[in-house]
Amino acid sequence: MLTLVFLTWHAAYVVADDKQGGLSTISHVGFLEEKAKSGDIKTQLRLGTMYRDGQGVPRNSQKSFYWFLQAANKGNVPAQLRVAKMLERGVGTNENKAAAFIWFSKAAKSGNNDALTNVGKMHQFGIGTQIDLQKAFRSYLRAAEQNQSEAQFHVAQMLYKGLGINKDMGNAIIWFEKSANQGNVDAKNLLGTFYLKGIGVPKSTDRGLELIISAATEGHPAAFHNLGLVYQLGLGVPRNDIYAYLWFAVATKSGHQSAKRFREGAALSMTPDAINTARALASACERKNFKMCISF
């Protein structure tokens, strides 16, 4: 049966192919907006996404925020999360950290891992709410127990430093390992340094280098800096001033705050030719966007 949809002069439409069923549907944006105004949450969420991504309509962050907010007010968790992030960053609306915290908290009540992690951060650093390390830890822990790798890292950090909870290096290592095993580069880098130094774990240069190199291949600035230290101090590898300078230079370019000082320190014991060689290697690494440079 053929259904005709008449479009008014102001109509915009989206053509979407359904690869599963081989169907082609035309969704009139005006029709979608009327449906959304009637309270259909899925359509409100869809319109928010369309305006956010420019799917068949011009990008419009204000309209995107408006439709996400309509769905969020009806309890839709994905919409609540998007509203919170837009308020936090001032996208499509005025920046409002306190309001962002409220919406993250609403989404967190459903157990949403992303929301729980954000609530934890806001409690930890006093963003949009007062600092409360105990609440931060509890929020992180709820997400960590559901295998959210970033939350696992934060739980580990707080246990390691005794923030909002008693220090517990044994449990901190467990959470660092869980986070690293899920690919969290912060956890890989820090855990790698623990293995190199034997902090909370048996000393293992092999395991330490494996973790730090893994983080470095993903472009982690602190891992670049740690590779510089590895070569400068000869931790599991022969000492090499050129490679130390190289990695300090790469870390500096990547935004690591103290790497420049280490690079300049390394240069004091190097010849001009060695410095030029290290700089050339660093430039080659930069052309690779600082990733996959471990072959040097």
Can you say where each PLM-predicted feature lies in the sequence?
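N-terminal leader/linker segments that initiate helical-solenoid repeat arrays
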Residues: 7-49, 294
